[in-house]
Swiss-Prot record:
Zinc finger (C4-type): 22-43
Protein name, as recorded: Small ribosomal subunit protein eS31
GO molecular function, one term: structural constituent of ribosome
Record key words, sorted: Metal-binding, Ribonucleoprotein, Ribosomal protein, Zinc, Zinc-finger
Gene3D superfamilies assigned to the protein according to its UniProt record, in alphabetical order: 6.20.50.180
Gene this chain is encoded by: rps27ae
Organism: Pyrococcus furiosus (strain ATCC 43587 / DSM 3638 / JCM 8422 / Vc1)
Taxonomic lineage: Archaea, Methanobacteriati, Methanobacteriota, Thermococci, Thermococcales
Keyword Cytoplasm: no
């Protein structure tokens, strides 16, 4: 917790998100990239990568 600044980067003066937001929890709750899937640590929602 407390390191959300690592999930953003600035390119050409614009802020770009590195990870996806959780569709259940909404903006502000990032999903973790586990290689074969995206997972939300708050609600447990998981999206499998192809």
């Amino acid at each position: 917790m407390g390191q959300k600044w690592k999930l953003y980067e600035i390119k050409d003066g614009k802020v770009i998100r590195k990870n996806k937001f959780c569709p259940r929890c909404g903006p502000g709750v990032f999903m973790a990239d586990h290689g074969d899937r995206w997972a939300c640590g708050k609600c447990g929602y998981t999206e499998w990568k192809k």
